Amino acid sequence: MFRKILGTLVVFPIIRVLFRIQDSLRAGPMRDAGLMLAGEKSIYQARQHRALISTMEYVEKHMPHVASVKCKPELLAKAFSLADVSGDRIICEFGVFKGESINHVAKLTNQTLYGFDSFEGLAEEWGDTWKKGDFLVPKLPKVRDNVTLVKGWFNETLPPFLKEHTGKVGFLHVDCDLYSSCKTIFELMESRLVPGTVIVFDEFFNYPQWEDGEFKAFQEFLAKTKLSCEFIGYNRNGEQAAVILK
């Protein structure tokens, strides 16, 4: 009798969970079943979960055979190895913050890298989490000898820079978070981004509303210029993706 009672106590909760999954599958996608099963009540976590699912679907559709990497530094190194940075081609990063990424790439070459950042934080709110001024850097980060920092807002610093540096872009790392900032980059550098240019996006996908950020600015750039791209890698544990323009 005791064993029967114990078995009933164990089985009933499992049955209840199975019914909850079944009901969820009837009501919506599998992702909702996962949330219901976990008892998730955080709106942020729920939105992140949905972003993960939409990112997975994008990867399966647009880059099913593209090799992924386990971390951002690995993607930067892989992308840089495929970039043509010979002659007067420009190597640049937009969104330096504390200098970790640009220093990582700088170790891979003796050429000069240009890092653009206002160092005053976000120019506007980003999503429902980050506020204007977040990511403020009180003083310029320490960078390697082959890195030149260009301090200021992109729309103010890029025009004079491009007048002085006439080469095409060989390698571009976009880490500016905001759609507006990314749009500014693509508008001002449009003629310098050519077939063969390698671009690494730091926030391409896998976060809530990723379709409205760097991803959107890039799609608009492709539509305007009639260029295409080939994915050359992505971070399977993060938000980064790398492309080469065609």
Language model region names:
Residues 2-17, 21:
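Alpha-helical hydrophobic membrane-insertion segments
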Residues 12, 28, 137-140:
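Intrinsic-disorder/low-complexity coil detector
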Residues 18-93, 102:
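Class I SAM-dependent methyltransferase Rossmann-like catalytic core
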Residues 56-58, 77, 85-246:
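S-adenosylmethionine/decaboxylated-SAM
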